[in-house]
Amino acid sequence: LRAVMKFLPFYLITSLFVWSSAVYGQVSQILEDEAVAWLQGLIRVDTINPPGNETRAVEFFADIFDAEGISYETAESAPGRGNIWAKIEGGDEPALILLQHTDVVPAEEEFWTIDPLSGDIRDGYILGRGARDMKGLGIIQLATFLSLHRSGVELNRDVIFLATADEEAGGFFGVGWLIDNHPEIFEDVGFLLNEGGGGSSDEGDIVFGVEVTQKVPVWLRLTAIDTPGHGSSPRPQTAVTRIVQALNTLLENPFPPRIIGPVNDYFAALSVDMNEEWGPSYADINSAIQDPAFVEKLHANRAGHNSLIRDTCSMTRMSGSSKINVIPPTAWAELDCRILPDKPAEQFIAELDELIGYTGVEIETIMAFTPAISETNSRLFDAIVSVTQELHPGSRVIPSVSTGFTDSHFTRDLGIVSYGFNPLITESGEHTGVHGNDEQVREAAFRQAVTDYYAVVRNVVID
């Protein structure tokens, strides 16, 4: 065999290597190298939203698909707002979508130590806006999709690669638009993998969070109207004081804690590795939240977990007069509210109106999604558990609830079982820079995630 291999062309050896690795559930060093290069290249494609310009990313993927001989379709929801999808056909089982968004949030270059669109590797890390959110996972999905294509193995279901626009601004030019204008993409789809989960390692203890639901964003504008006047003659009540009064009422009356099923499961799983200070409370979180002292301590020390036990509203924008010496006729404030997915937005808004309605402010809904939860009794979730435990002995998989939102809420509304899963392992204390400065992903962890993601998907799509 060695003698035969000696005279084979390099490209054929490469193809055999990739094929044999794919057949046995692994990806090759060659594909890992390609994935690193692809991620660097995709980071360099400017898709900062606003304005998005995701068609640039569509062209990036189209070039790769053309080289691989893979057919694909594209559609713009607006000029420059491109979406692309491709399919590997398989058997009659409900299809699997690998979903990613190609837009990224802005980066304030003066606070970075490197060009945010450089994609350079420094000290073992790939840097740039989107390295983690979510061009990194997008390339991991691409590597899996191409591995399946190159292997030529028979699949039990269709596998769809879907890269979309606008998630960072709500997804209305991406998945939301595609559901309305290209519903055929989502027909006969049973499973979807998206962002929202991740792996963490603390002194070798590895935990993979799989997002099964998320808090529902309810973005609101409070508006007050009152008599205008000169700033030199203060009035006892103005549009501005009404807004201040409403906001102060919100501050003084936090929404009461309550526990939904996925949060209870999540806290119970976390309790296993916690010390005596936190472990018993997390193990029985329903009882723990009855103690105001615990709730206060949780809020002070673990803000993210506090957000999982109650509805929240962050005060993010305000406006009053355009001049310092004018009492304005109107004033407004905007709230980023996130509610647990066990109640509709309409009920939450009615409760909010009961709380602050006495101030005379009007509540306007800017954006609100519908709540949905993906159950864990599925072949896909079982595959995530079994494969990650095989690849990382002793690791655990925890169903998690995201305080942020992803495009999965759109697909859950269609009845598609949608999980946020990313096998990328982040070490305790490791800088990530997601939505911040010097966003980065450890190259070694990224390479491992390429292998792990493919193994999970392969388990589901090959009998």
Which residues make up each language-model segment?
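Bacterial N-terminal signal peptides that target proteins for export
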Residues: L1-L12
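N-terminal signal peptide c-region/cleavage motif recognized by signal peptidases
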Residues: S20-A22
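Acidic/His- and Gly-rich active-site-bordering loop/insert found
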Residues: Q26-R129, L148-R157, L335
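Acidic/histidine-rich, surface-exposed loop or edge segments in extracytoplasmic proteins
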Residues: A37-T47, T223-D226, T359-M367
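An extended, acidic, His-containing surface patch that forms the Zn2+-binding/catalytic region
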Residues: G90, G198-E203, P256-S322, P329, ...
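Acidic/histidine-rich catalytic neighborhood of metal-dependent amide-processing enzymes
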Residues: I126, R132-G209
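A short core secondary-structure module
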Residues: G176-L178, S232-P256
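Short amphipathic alpha-helices in soluble, non-transmembrane regions
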Residues: Q237, F348-I356
